[in-house]
């Protein structure tokens, strides 16, 4: 983790000191706070509610992929042995704990007070689905609302890793019923051409036109990013 701080974030966060962090959780907290405070300065004069959004960071270092999630969203990865895996985070009451609350003491205190009075409404749930091994079974982990959401996966085990906003689960049909999310993920992660902006090309040229033709629309913004790992590079 200390090497990650030095190698990956030295340019963006030049004041980071290696001795300041002994655990990945500490790094997670530092990076989150640094980003939101810099964003607040950059958006001075703009309505601050624009910063109430999920942030997902994925980076590769030392043969591992690290994913830091702040808010709600999805991590999807194709394991070479176990197949497709889906990790989702959700907050009871549809009230994610956004980084922006850390830059506003009043919002932070209000969120903490509400979480103290109604803990069942501010529980973070991390859901694990092994889509290929057992698609109907999931493992739920209940956490406090501010629990660090961190994934660390060896590159050698991966052929693909994707991060996505919760909008990927917002597609509904003409009856206003949610479509099969796992099937949608299988369609998106079925990558034939790996050149250029392959995710954008896949979504804009194939997935979205096909869904629209079937009267299936999304009611929330969809953001997706992905890593594809070369078989030879992974050994």
Which residues does each PLM region occupy?
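Short, surface-exposed, charged loop/turn segments at secondary-structure junctions
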Residues: 73-75, 81-94, 175-187
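C-terminal catalytic subdomain
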Residues: 116-235
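Catalytic core of PPM/PP2C metal-dependent serine/threonine phosphatase domains
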Residues: 12-76, 108-155, 216-219
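Primarily the active-site beta-strand->alpha-helix module of PP2C/PPM metal-dependent phosphatases
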Residues: 1-17
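Short amphipathic alpha-helical segments
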Residues: 1, 19-27, 31, 180, ...
